[in-house]
From Swiss-Prot:
Family: Belongs to the universal ribosomal protein uL16 family.
A matching Pfam family: Ribosomal_L16
GO cellular component, as recorded: cytosolic large ribosomal subunit
The keyword Metal-binding is annotated on this UniProt entry: no
HAMAP family named among the record's database cross-references: Ribosomal_uL16
GO molecular function (one): rRNA binding
InterPro entries for this protein: Ribosomal_uL16, Ribosomal_uL16_bact-type, Ribosomal_uL16_CS, Ribosomal_uL16_dom, Ribosomal_uL16_sf
Reported function: Binds 23S rRNA and is also seen to make contacts with the A and possibly P site tRNAs.
Subunit comment: Part of the 50S ribosomal subunit.
Gene name of this polypeptide: rplP
Protein name from the UniProt record: Large ribosomal subunit protein uL16
Keyword Transcription: no
Species this chain originates from: Tropheryma whipplei (strain Twist) (Whipple's bacillus)
């Protein structure tokens, strides 16, 4: 189940702004444990799928996995041994622009040790530094 947009308005996009911290998606919303990015990177649809498979195979039945990132940006590439100019290359693959602080995956329904081991397996599949975080319950005064 590769994550690819079904329909896009334009085939090619400008490169995204990669500076700063993640403004949204920095708290665990659905699960009990999650993976938080500590560095910035492009995560491809193949890497997202590889991390998902690694987690679900380790958790097996009983647990639930949420994917909070979506590769919605095409990265283009020119063919090898092509002269400069003559326009932008064709879309090669889809990426998600990840900034520090972003919660990428969440897990619930399993024990703490099993969840942390599954999340560590997913972290090893990703091209960035990340850590495992636990859900924090906030009351209205804490927000």
């Amino acid at each position: 189940m590769m994550l690819i947009p079904k329909k896009v308005k334009f085939r090619k996009q400008h490169r995204p702004n990669r500076k700063g911290m993640s403004g949204c998606g920095t708290r665990i919303v659905f699960g009990d444990y999650g993976i938080q990015a500590l560095s910035r990177a492009y995560v491809t649809n193949r890497q997202v799928e590889s991390a998902r498979i690694a987690m679900t195979r380790h958790i097996r039945r009983g647990g639930r996995v949420w994917i909070n990132i979506y590769p919605d940006r095409p990265l283009t590439k020119k063919p090898a041994e092509t002269r400069m100019g003559s326009g932008k290359g064709s879309p090669e693959y889809w990426v998600a622009n990840i900034r520090p602080g972003r919660i990428m995956f969440e897990v619930s329904g399993v024990s703490e040790s099993l969840a942390k081991e599954a999340l560590m397996r997913a972290i090893h599949k990703l091209p960035l530094r990340a850590r495992i975080v636990e859900r924090q319950e906030f009351d209205d005064a804490g927000l």
